[in-house]
Amino acid sequence: MGKTIRLTTAQALIQFLNRQYIHVDGKEEPFVEGIFTIFGHGNVLGIGQALEQDAGHLKVYQGKNEQGMAHAAMAYSKQMLRRKIYAVSTSVGPGAANLTAAAGTALANHIPVLLLPADTFATRQPDPVLQQVEQEYSAAVTTNDALKPVSRYWDRITRPEQLMSSLIRAFEVMTDPAKAGPATICISQDVEGEAFDFDESFFEKRVHYIDRMQPSERELKGAAERIKQSSRPVILVGGGAKYSGAREELIALSETYGIPLVETQAGKSTVEADFANNLGGMGITGTLAANKAARQADLIIGVGTRYTDFATSSKTAFDFDKAKFLNINVSRMQAYKLDAFQVVADAKVTLGRLHGLLDGYKSAFGTAIKDWKDEWQAERDRLGKVTFTRDAFEPEIKNHFSQDVLNEYADALGTELPQTTALLTINDTIPEDSVVISSAGSLPGDLQRLWHSNVPNTYHLEYGYSCMGYEVSGTLGLKLAHPDKEVYSLVGDGSFLMLHSELITALQYNKKINVLLFDNSGFGCINNLQMDHGSGSYFCEFRTEDNQILNVDYAKVAEGYGAKTYRANTVEELKAALEDAKTQDVSTLIEMKVLPKTMTDGYDSWWHVGVAEVSEQKSVQRAYEAKETKLKSAKQY
């Protein structure tokens, strides 16, 4: 063994984080940008002491909620295309438990983040300590075991020397494009402060090379043959295409060979919305244009996609009698889906090499791509100009609320603003290079269908876990990634109530974020779901005990935190608020009261959800029968 240096486990951890670098396409930079922390008795005297003594280049931010700060860390990594991360340090017990939802969010989205929850005593001398759970069947079980199912890598450190192999394994996982996800290292609180003679070589600069995985000649030949044999291929652009940086290759392939592009939520803004062959999002929350193309396709080229139920309309979006699949993915598991021909390789490299193998090919779509795009643009224009009337108004979500109920909402909330009109007003008003973020409720559907991003990587949707509360927290992560851009959280009142603690963190550190709050006084998306399937409007509206609609003054709440706030219930007020918000140096919140049922509906799509097989309600019985009928046309696996 060579020279050693005596450090506590926590001090060794911080030194190691400072020496991790990533190398992609000839560019080398530090991989760990900083650390979010909320100190408690499990980490303040270990990691807290180490950071105070020497944080190195790490930026340290004090979070306000463990889930919130972990979401901020995840959003930063996602926006940086998984090439930089923040670590997250929490105390033992409830602080660690609060990481669970955020870890699941990162895992579902394949986003690297380093989670460092403190753990109970390795010696067990003071057991049970404050915030420790006890199980009769095992003294080894702690709250942190709950993080195992939602971590790509999980370990518990009960000896200082264990840290070395554990960290190397964690960084191997986080820097692997095929496996990237949350790495959780639980460090016993007594071990954090325990000293050990660490080998100095452990702290040498360590470069993690992300070399682009090359396709084999067999894979390229097979892929090219399948494209040439098809007449109507469609490229499904997933998040992997964005992380690979495959924009130019996608455009070239699409333009040259007449292949339309359709997008997943994660893949949106890989290619600009105004690109002629980009038909927008597909599936349950997709455009009619994209869904028409998918329905006619005889080959689906999935580029970096997981084929979630929302992208495939629960496996009903395609004509499976004729459609074949070609999957390009760095993950072998993902490439195997839907009985596809698999190319397990980097998207950018593979698409670039395929381009030269398709000479003379042209799809049979002809003018259909332009026709579908024009048709959808006309529908988008209509949705941007919806106006409410107090008599005979037909909302986008039909046959749920009567005119009287809609009028009741208009009176209670003091608004006549439809959601789609508000959304497209925002799209037309904010700077084109702004980055927008959303996650849950009806807004992701509206955004995937309607939002035009004409600057790459400016559309940030967390729709793998669709975690309520990600929207505001994640906006802080966006601002850390893009300090010179305007960043906007598009969030419903339900998600805002679920979690918005990191708005205070943004204000504390003068990281300007803009919160655009759509308040329809309820869980509107799920209300649509229940009523679409035969149930009544049951506990999804925000109503008082005497059935009055809640009207919360969210602008006043944010004003109390120190944000610049606005109330905008008309298009004119919204435009004025957006323009003024651009001039502010402090975080802003624009509260919009919007009418329920004025979000977009589905376009030639279907979602398989559980419906009661037995019910006293005829409407539920009909919904169940309709579901069973639709399933007959769905692929079984």
Curated annotation (Swiss-Prot):
Reaction equation(s) it catalyzes: 3D-3,5/4-trihydroxycyclohexane-1,2-dione + H2O = 5-deoxy-D-glucuronate + H(+)
GO biological process, one term: isoleucine biosynthetic process
Record flagged with keyword Cell membrane: no
Amino-acid positions noted as binding thiamine diphosphate in the UniProt annotation, renumbered to this chain: E66
Binding site residues for Mg(2+): D493, N520
Region: Thiamine pyrophosphate binding, residue numbers: 442-522
Co-factor binding details: Binds 1 Mg(2+) ion per subunit.
GO cellular component, as recorded: acetolactate synthase complex
Enzyme Commission code(s) on record: 3.7.1.22
Function: Involved in the cleavage of the C1-C2 bond of 3D-(3,5/4)-trihydroxycyclohexane-1,2-dione (THcHDO) to yield 5-deoxy-glucuronate (5DG).
Family recorded in the similarity comment: Belongs to the TPP enzyme family.
Protein name from the UniProt record: 3D-(3,5/4)-trihydroxycyclohexane-1,2-dione hydrolase
Taxonomic source organism: Bacillus velezensis (strain DSM 23117 / BGSC 10A6 / LMG 26770 / FZB42) (Bacillus amyloliquefaciens subsp. plantarum)
